[in-house]
Amino acid sequence: MCATHTHSGPTGTLQEDFVAGYHNVKVTGRYDPHLVGYMIRSIESGIHHAYNHREQAVIRYGFNQVTSVASNRNDASIECDQTLLAIEISLVGGSKILVYNYGCHPTVLSARNSLYTSDWLLGVKKQASKDGYDMTVFLNGSSADISTRYTRIESTFKEADRLGALVYQHIREALQYTEILLTQEHVTYSKQHNMKLKDTHESVDISIPILRLDDLYFLFIPAELCSTLSLPIRNKYGQKVIFCTLSNNCYAYIADQKAYENQWYEALASPFAMGEGEKLMEMIDGYIKEII
């Protein structure tokens, strides 16, 4: 279960006891069980429909480095992960699906906007539809500290479409030089990791599922993860290690030590103690060594 968020969605989706009290009701609103129930039923319906309508498919994928779309939102000079993975799924029935992984907050629109929107993701979808894709699926990468803060010209729907079109341009380029996914099976792994909470002696166990498809390793992180934490691992193992964040749960932010030292928002909004992000990456690094 992979999610993302814009700054233009409904309130009421987080419970008040969310992560040991790290929950800002003024921002996220009171928990709305009716809204959440509707969302759960919709997701369940989608899962059942997809499972009951499975088809054979040809899957191809490619990578690209994105430019001029996003940067570190605290300091644009800090290096961040700009790798984009594009996956094209061509079903035997004729439908074509685009799945892409890229680390960036879809937050072009500002607080002045009061309309629900998928932000620049809609710009991608519009362009993909022109190329015959029936569905687009976004897997957000390590985006906790990445946004369009220093790259957007203005906070408008037009600008969201422009940046979305720019992301799609990089997707098209990635799919010009592709590899075919040959596997008929997938392999899944799962690793538990204990993380200490700040300002308390308590801790939580988080689960990190890993999906292997051929030589691709998808790591599912149940929080917004800072790019500064995951980038060294991607630099070490290459593009085949793919981080998908806000997956299966939402433990707010996992920030690096520098964010705590500078009191950046990612650290202030994180429920975890300083240094826990680095410990998580150390665990992941060791586990990847075992399974690759």
Where are the regions a protein language model picked out?
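Conserved beta-alpha junction segments in alpha/beta enzyme cores
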Residues: 1-143, 147-152, 157-162, 175, ...
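Anionic-ligand-binding alpha/beta catalytic cores of soluble enzymes and soluble regulatory domains
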Residues: 167-172
